[in-house]
């Protein structure tokens, strides 16, 4: 399988990945930065969306996997099924925001995002449920941070 050498796994810190990704996008302007958030994490730190949109990094894609639950911490429901994250992203000032609910549209949006020269928000509606063999990180948070920082330099 694919390793996580280039990933910064923010396990246990729901909502901070978009802020971290913004900082990286601002310092690595020649690299495409992909931030994958969950709906629960996005909702926990929704103010980050306003900050992201105000900075408009043209090399960043913000993807929110919306299964309407805090799945990794027990599956408690979120309110993401009752609100419109795309409208919120647009209201915050994202230049492009879209919601997809099938693989064909997701593939199309990811290909377009790869080539785009502007901040993009992609909400992916998905079902609740994760792989039975989905593991946890095998490194400590400190090791993960250090490896990621080495990769950035």
Residue ranges and their predicted role:
Residues 74-77, 135:
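Short, solvent-exposed loop/turn segments at secondary-structure boundaries
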Residues 76-111:
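Conserved thiamine diphosphate
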Residues 15-17, 103-108, 128-130:
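A short acidic, often aromatic-flanked loop/helix-cap motif at beta-alpha or helix-coil junctions
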Residues 9-10, 35, 98-101, 124:
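General beta-strand structural signal in soluble alpha/beta enzymes
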Residues 1-67:
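Thiamine diphosphate
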Residues 39, 60-63, 71, 81-88, ...:
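Structured catalytic cores of enzymes that bind and process phosphorylated ligands/cofactors
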Residues 3, 116-153:
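Glycine/aspartate-rich loop-and-adjacent alpha/beta segment that forms the canonical ThDP
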Residues 67-75:
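Long, charge-dense
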């Amino acid at each position: 399988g694919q390793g996580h050498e280039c990933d910064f796994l923010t396990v246990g810190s729901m909502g901070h990945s978009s802020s971290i990704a913004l900082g990286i996008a601002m310092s690595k302007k020649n690299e495409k930065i992909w931030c994958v958030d969950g709906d629960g994490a996005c909702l926990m730190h929704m103010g980050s969306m306003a900050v992201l949109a105000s900075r408009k990094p043209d090399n960043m894609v913000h993807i929110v996997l919306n299964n309407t639950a805090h799945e990794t911490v027990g599956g408690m429901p979120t309110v993401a099924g009752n609100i419109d994250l795309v409208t919120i992203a647009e209201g915050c000032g994202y230049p492009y925001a879209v919601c997809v609910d099938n693989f064909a549209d997701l593939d199309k949006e990811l290909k377009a995002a790869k080539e785009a020269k502007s901040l993009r928000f992609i909400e992916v509606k998905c079902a609740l449920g994760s792989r039975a063999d989905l593991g946890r990180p095998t490194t400590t948070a400190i090791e993960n941070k250090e490896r990621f920082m080495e990769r950035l330099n």
